[in-house]
Each structure stands twice: as structure tokens, then as C-alpha cells.
Amino acid sequence: MEIRAEEISEIIRKQIKEYGKEVEVAETGTIISVGDGIARIHGLDKAMAGELLEFPGGVSGMVLNLEEDNVGAAILGEDNENIKEGTTVKRTGRIVEVPVGEALIGRVVNAIGQPIDGKGPINTTTFGKVEVKAPGIVKRKSVHQPMQTGLKAIDSMVPIGRGQRELIIGDRQTGKTAVAIDTIINQKGGDLICIYVAIGQKRSTVAQVVSKLQEYGAMDYTIVVSASASEPAPLQFIAPYTGVTMGEYFRDNGKHALIIYDDLSKQAVAYRQLSLLLRRPPGREAYPGDVFYLHSRLLERAAKLSDDCGAGSLTALPIIETQAGDVSAYIPTNVISITDGQIYLESDLFYSGVRPAINVGLSVSRVGGSAQVKAMKQVAGTLRLNLAQYREMAAFAQFGSDLDKATQMQLARGERLVEILKQPQYRPIPNEKQVLVIFAANNGFVDEYPVSSLRRYESELYSFFDSRKADILAELRDKKAIDDDLKAKMIAALEELKKEFTA
């Protein structure tokens, strides 16, 4: 084979022409200790707080502590054999981001937005920063649109508005998750996108919730973020921020979203674990000093935006689990002071058959009243007072049997109101039907029936109005208020039902 000098020189010239001078510069550090989801890294002098790090084996990490001679980072994933002392960690120069957008709807993802439902990758090119500043005062608008839960006791006495933060608090096994799931199911056919964040729960429980949501067609507008009990503390800590980042995408694009954190006590425990491993000084109940900020910066991101900012909203329903009804513990008092009200669920009520087990005296909605539908405001105005008086009288009535007629009537009415406000799980009720049944109870239409027949009366009332008085339901739905004319129609219809219903 003949070697041609001109050919060789041509190839060399071409190579020189195409030679790229780019040099890849990476800032790296060395792991000096690792364990329990925490790595200490030497050599990352320019790392930022909250920065994303690249660990060996494709695992990510997040910078939490910036110290004089090392950096403390949380490993966002399972500790694997590739992450050990002496291995190299790279800086990315980016803050932790998660995928956001419409493509996530109907999916179940982990704490960093990766799909775990076996339905393939999520096709989205949009990412959102996990840590961002909450909207300022100028960007906000006061809460004025209702967010219906479909639960009579809540929509009538503890109304929630779009953009509000309403805490659901109670002991374990009092129906906190049930209230949240019913609220999601009630949004079917509406314009709310729901995000359910499961923190520190059993995988079987999360699977059960997802199957219930699928059964009622609610996964069509729901995203589930799961950081189960078996996952490392850093993932349980970051999951709520991942969820709120996904919700903010809809809020900032003029849409309406609802996010449920189930539950924040477990997130606080995970954060306590992280902080103690990072050797941060412990405070009350061994929680770090910034545990209030942990929840306040999360919940402040739920807001109703002003018209100039697109008028979107993000409503938050955080859940907190109490120990033996102790609402004055550290985390419960923190979250109560951050939120715009709380729904307090009581185990005594739950076991006595009052479900949802809402304690009306301790539950309050600080801003929801201005968002409540006017018709509901008209019928439920005295409901809370009547129930509070009934509870007080019932306590005294235990001591004496000879009660006057007025007291007996008030006790009978109260008993019926409590019965009417009971509701089975997974059966949210539209607002106009709630108004009707509370109107009937308030105006004495159920006084003569025994308490045991009220559940049947309620279902017959709904079917009677659905089949024969649909115009009244439509008028209630459209007007959202009760005028004299509509009131007369409602009374006439209820009188007609009274003749037909036999207890």
C-alpha cells in the first residue's frame, strides 16, 4: 500500500480545523463520612445551600450544611454500595428541581418526581425549583371563592376558600385522611387539580388510597407524591416541597390546585432526624430551632393570586397527627399558628358514631367565611351556635330528668342536627343538596321523625328533589342564594315530601 503525503497532510489539516478547545471543568469533592442518608464532603468550597450534587451511581444529593472544612448533604435516594468514603461527588451548580406540568396528572411519583407507577417515563420538559420564595403581599388577593369538600359539617360550619390553608388535626384513626380523600373525590367534574402527598406512610396504605381514587375516577385530575415509611429521611423531608412545586405550576398559570400533606408530623420527625445527624443544636422536643420555618415556608406557598398575576390559586390541607388529643404540643401549635384555621377531629366522637368526627367547638375557619356560598351562609348561620348549645345542654341533662318543654325541644333538635351532619365515607354531597337538608333540619321538618330514620329521610329527600323538583336544585345551583320566592318553593316541596315520607 502506497502512502501519499498530500492525503495525510489533508487529514491532519482537517483534524486541526475541527479540533475543539472546550475543556470540561467539574468541581468535585471527596466523601469523608456517610451514613443514615447523610454524607459529609470535603473540597466543595463553593457549594451553595440547597444545591444539587451528583453522587456515584446516578444518585442525587442536596446541600444542607455549609461548614468551615466540609459540606453536609442529604442523599436523595437509597444509600448504595457506590456511595462510600473516598468516592467523588460533583457539583451541578443547580438548585434541586422536579418535573412539573400537565403530564404528571394521573401519575404516582416519588419524592423527587420520578414515576413509581410502572406507566413509563413522564414526558415533560418543564421543571420547577423545589425551594422558591412564596408570593408577596402585592401578588395576593383575599380568599373569596369557595373550595367545596362535599362534607356537610365542613362546608356549613368550617368553610374553606380557594387559596386558604386549613389544618386537619386529630389523633390517629379519627378519619383525617378520609376527609382529605372525600375532598379530592368531590372535585370530579370541576376545575381543581389535586395533589396528594403521602409522607412516611405504609406503601400498602398509599396503594389503597390510589386504588380508591381510581375507583371514583379521581386520578384523572390527581397527582400522588409518595415518600413511604421505608424510604430515607431526606426523601420524606423533601416530598412536601416537591408536591407544592407541582401545585405552584398550576397556580402560576391561572389554574386552581389543591394540595394535601398527609402528614406533616412525619415530615417534622424526618427533618429532626436529618438535623440531629447534621449535628445541628436540638431545641424543644429535640426538634431543631428552624422547624417552624420548615412548615411556614411550605404553607406560605399556598395562595390566591391577584388578577394581575393570573388569578390562580393553591389551597393547602395539611394534616397533623396528635398524641392523645394534645393540641398544645410543639408541632401542632406551630402549624395551627401558620394556617388559616383548623378542623379538629376527636376520637370520642369518632367512636360514638359521629363521622366525620368534627369537634365544632374547636374547629374554625378564619378566612373561609368570606368564600362561603351565600345560600349556605343563610341556612348554616345559626348551626354552629345551636350545636354548641345542644352539647352544653346535653351535658347538664345527664344530671336531671325533669326538663322543661323548651329544653327538651332544643335537645331533640340538636340530636337531629348531629344525625343530619353525619356522612358515610366516599359520598360527597353537592352544595345545593347540603343546603336543602340543613334547611329542612333547621326549619323543623325532621323534628317529628325518630333519629334512626333520618338517614333514610335524607336519601329520600335527595331522590325526591332529583326526580320531581330538579328546578329548585337548579335554581339553588345558579342563584347561590335563597330569596323569598325560592324559600317558599323549598318549604312547599318539603311539605309535599312530608306527606309521602313515613318514618
Curated annotation (Swiss-Prot):
What class does this enzyme belong to in the EC scheme? translocase
Gene Ontology molecular functions: ADP binding; ATP binding; proton-transporting ATP synthase activity, rotational mechanism
Identify the EC number(s).
Answer: 7.1.2.2
Q: The organism sits in which domain of life?
A: Bacteria
Membrane topology for this entry? Peripheral membrane protein
| Keyword Cell inner membrane included in the entry's annotation | yes
Entry keywords, A to Z: ATP synthesis, ATP-binding, Cell inner membrane, Cell membrane, CF(1), Hydrogen ion transport, Ion transport, Membrane, Nucleotide-binding, Translocase, Transport
Q: What does the record list as GO biological process? A: proton motive force-driven ATP synthesis
Q: Where in the cell is it found?
A: Cell inner membrane
Q: Which Pfam families match?
A: ATP-synt_ab, ATP-synt_ab_C, ATP-synt_ab_N
Q: Where along this sequence does the record place binding of ATP? A: 170-177
Q: Enumerate the catalysed reactions.
A: ATP + H2O + 4 H(+)(in) = ADP + phosphate + 5 H(+)(out)
Q: Name one GO cellular component term.
A: plasma membrane
For the site Required for activity, which positions are given?
Answer: 363
**What's this chain's function?**
Produces ATP from ADP in the presence of a proton gradient across the membrane. The alpha chain is a regulatory subunit.
- Quaternary state and partners of this protein? F-type ATPases have 2 components, CF(1) - the catalytic core - and CF(0) - the membrane proton channel. CF(1) has five subunits: alpha(3), beta(3), gamma(1), delta(1), epsilon(1). CF(0) has three main subunits: a(1), b(2) and c(9-12). The alpha and beta chains form an alternating ring which encloses part of the gamma chain. CF(1) is attached to CF(0) by a central stalk formed by the gamma and epsilon chains, while a peripheral stalk is formed by the delta and b chains.
Family from the record: Belongs to the ATPase alpha/beta chains family.
Q: What is this protein called?
A: ATP synthase subunit alpha
Q: Which organism is it from?
A: Geobacter sulfurreducens (strain ATCC 51573 / DSM 12127 / PCA)
